[in-house]
């Protein structure tokens, strides 16, 4: 379990610090439990302002990984091959966008045709607000909204003219949740999806530890970076879940060699195209 999974509750209610610490200890994550026990609290709850500030620092550090892995360029390269034909507007939706680094990078380089609208969606309102502020300050043609991207009417209005992407999201889902993740996109009838996540292997785990020790300063970032690599789903699990959840899509995981991997391949995409 990653510490960031516990910093905010789905309901928006304050998080009881002692409960978060106890949960981590029950899972044998004593180091993570100690890290959480040192976070600021008010009346037994994690201090909301301090937690939000920590979340922003963590995601700013996470952008370093996106820059190193050239995610903006790589996502744009794949999305260009998935865009529906015709000159009508197409919407590219980044689910779990965080600070919107991927879309902001694409917008800054104008790597997709003018008919493409870039929209980032995240459940965390603090991250969405900061993503919107950054886009505005950088003068970028992309926007960010808070909510569940797969709820009808939130952001996907015309599935046939929509491509859904994400980066580093799927490992936050339990194996039993993956079917529903893909099924939600199929129900909306999206033209295609491309979800980047960690390819689990010895090299990715070792690389995550080295990178986060060298480039990250927050204890939470260092812990969660390695945990992300350890909990990532193998290609077989993703393919099976996508096949069950989105049977009308042609699915593939574009994965390099595990024994002679390229550094950029540590995050590889699962791509689905509606038949």
Task: Name what the model sees in each region.
Residues 198-246:
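C-terminal alpha-helical "lid/dimerization" subdomain adjacent to the S-adenosyl-L-methionine
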Residues 189-199:
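Conserved beta-strand signature within the Rossmann-like core of class I S-adenosyl-L-methionine
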Residues 93, 99-151:
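Class I SAM-dependent methyltransferase SAM/SAH-binding core
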Residues 151-158:
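Short conserved loop adjoining the S-adenosyl-L-methionine
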Residues 1-48:
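N-terminal auxiliary segments of SAM/dcSAM-dependent transferases
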Residues 165:
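A conserved beta-strand element that flanks and buttresses the S-adenosyl-L-methionine
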Residues 45-48, 52-78, 82-83:
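Class I SAM-dependent methyltransferase Rossmann-like catalytic core
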Residues 173-185:
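A short, conserved alpha-helix within the catalytic core of class I
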């Amino acid at each position: 379990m990653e510490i960031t999974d516990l910093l905010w509750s789905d309901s928006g209610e304050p998080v009881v610090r002692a409960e978060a610490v106890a949960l981590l200890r029950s899972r044998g994550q004593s180091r993570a439990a100690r890290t959480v026990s040192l976070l600021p609290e008010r009346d037994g709850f994690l201090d909301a302002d301090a937690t939000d500030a920590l979340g922003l620092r963590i995601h700013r550090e996470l952008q370093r990984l996106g820059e190193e892995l050239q995610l903006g360029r790589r996502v744009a390269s794949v999305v260009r091959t998935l865009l529906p034909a015709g000159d009508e507007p197409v919407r590219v939706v980044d689910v779990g966008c965080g600070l919107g680094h991927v879309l902001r990078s694409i917008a800054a380089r104008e790597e997709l045709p003018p008919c493409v609208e870039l929209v980032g969606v995240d459940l965390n309102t603090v991250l969405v607000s900061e993503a919107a502020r950054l886009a505005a300050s950088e003068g970028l043609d992309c926007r960010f909204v808070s909510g569940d991207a797969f709820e009808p009417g939130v952001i996907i209005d015309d599935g046939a003219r929509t491509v859904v992407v994400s980066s580093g999201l799927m490992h936050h889902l339990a194996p039993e949740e993956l079917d529903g993740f893909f099924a939600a996109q199929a129900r909306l009838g999206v033209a295609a999806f491309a979800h980047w996540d960690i390819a689990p292997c010895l090299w990715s785990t070792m690389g995550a530890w080295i990178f986060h020790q060298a480039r990250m300063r927050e204890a939470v970032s260092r812990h969660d970076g390695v945990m992300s690599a350890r909990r990532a789903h193998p290609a077989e699990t993703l393919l099976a879940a996508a096949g069950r959840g989105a049977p009308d899509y042609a699915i593939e995981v574009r994965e390099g060699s595990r024994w002679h991997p390229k550094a950029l391949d540590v995050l590889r995409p699962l791509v689905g195209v509606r038949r």
